[in-house]
Design a protein with these regions (language model features):
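The feature captures the beta-strand-to-loop junction immediately N-terminal to the Walker
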Residues: 35-37
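Non-catalytic connector elements of ABC transporters
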Residues: 237, 249-357
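Pre-Walker A (P-loop) beta-loop-beta motif of ABC nucleotide-binding domains
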Residues: 22-33
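ABC ATPase nucleotide-binding domain helices that frame the ATP-binding cleft
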Residues: 43-46, 142
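ABC ATPase nucleotide-binding domains
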Residues: 72-229
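Conserved ABC transporter NBD signature motif
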Residues: 58-66
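Helix-to-loop junction immediately C-terminal to a conserved catalytic motif
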Residues: 50
């Protein structure tokens, strides 16, 4: 059993309150990613789970056992850092076996565990090489392999792919997903890369200033952010956030003015919101370029980003850029006046307190 239960944890650095009354349950065998901007506390939280940082109050339990006072080696965890932390004078085999030798494991068991991990990660041919003879991706696989040999209950990853170039990051993402399926361990992953979070995770936890802003499966966070912070953080490009005015509300419908046009949308709202300033959130893929007179708004393109498979078009608006995603074969040009149709079924509505309505 390797579930993790964090209850009312606080962490201070002098007078700075970094982690604030933080509670989180992580299911056994799940892949959970902690994301957030720099300084939000995600790496600090990971280090507290690992036992590398003390907590000021609260409890952390792994597999039903409180670990507050246990050293890292007794917590049943293994950690993989952004830095590979390999010994340059040792071979790959020796690096992977180092922790096992410290634990005085029998040589036969060491050989078995190292070779088993090497097979999983497809690095059997590199076992007698030194780290300097390996690529960045191969070195990171060795670091992960060293963690696997310990047979931990929980893997902790602290931005492990940050030092790799773009193509290697894609390759390692695939390998991490495959690894999780193979060994079926509980994994906690810290990153600022939303693509990593979206593609790897069973659950994403978005942190903001030491607190949970939202948690859930990747598609829920992407399609239904609970507040403007998550809406603007999850997704690349981020969700368009457009000020609007609510002018009428009945049991089933809302009428609002957005970019000088009235919209009536079906929305069941529990509380009365008349005359409330709201913000409409709309993903770039939910705005469409119209070739007819059936459109909601028009504006000039001032930046066109053609990515090959798709194109992002940045349009001028009184409230800043509005981004539209379209097919690359539409051949949009900078300065072109475009007619835009909104998918009102995809509107996310936020009130003036930044929370979703």
């Amino acid at each position: 059993m390797a579930d993790i239960d964090i209850k009312s944890v606080n962490k201070f650095y002098d007078k700075v309150h970094v982690i604030k009354d933080f509670s989180l349950k992580i299911k056994e065998h799940s892949f959970t990613t902690l994301v957030g901007p720099s300084g939000c506390g995600k790496s600090t939280l990971l280090r507290m789970i690992a036992g590398l940082e003390d907590i000021n109050s609260g409890t952390i339990s792994i597999g039903g056992k409180e670990v507050n006072n246990l050293p890292p080696k007794e917590r049943g965890i293994a950690m993989v850092f952004q830095s590979y932390a390999l010994y340059p004078h040792m071979t790959v085999f020796e690096n992977m076996a180092f922790g096992l030798k410290i634990e005085k494991k029998p040589q036969e068991e060491i050989d078995h565990l190292v070779n088993e991990a090497a097979k999983i990660l497809q690095i059997e041919d590199y076992l007698q090489r030194k780290p300097k003879q390996l690529s960045g991706g191969q070195r990171q696989r060795v670091a992960i392999g060293r963690a696997i040999t310990r047979k931990p209950k929980v893997f902790l990853f602290d931005e492990p792919l940050s030092n790799l170039d773009a193509s290697l990051r894609v390759q390692m993402r695939v390998e991490l997903a495959k690894l999780h399926e193979q060994i079926d361990a509980t994994m906690i992953y810290v990153t600022h890369d939303q693509t990593e979070a979206m593609t790897l995770s069973d659950e994403i936890v978005v942190l903001d200033k030491g607190r949970i802003s939202q948690q859930g499966n990747p598609l829920n966070l992407y399609n239904q952010p609970s507040n403007i912070f998550v809406a603007s953080f999850i997704g690349s490009p981020k969700m368009n956030l457009i000020p609007a005015k609510l002018i009428n509300q009945d049991k089933d419908n809302l009428e609002l003015v957005l970019l000088n046009k009235k919209f009536q949308i079906k929305q069941t709202i529990k509380k009365e919101l008349k005359d409330e300033n709201i913000t409409v959130g709309l993903r770039p893929e939910n705005l469409h370029i119209s070739e007819t007179d059936d459109f909601d708004w028009q504006s000039k393109a001032f930046v066109v980003e053609n990515l090959g498979s798709n194109t992002f078009v940045y349009l001028e608006s009184p409230n800043g850029p509005i981004i539209v995603e379209c097919e690359s074969d539409q051949n949009i040009k900078t300065g072109q006046l475009l007619k835009i149709k909104f998918d009102t079924n995809k509107f996310n509505l936020f009130n003036d307190h930044d929370s979703i309505i």
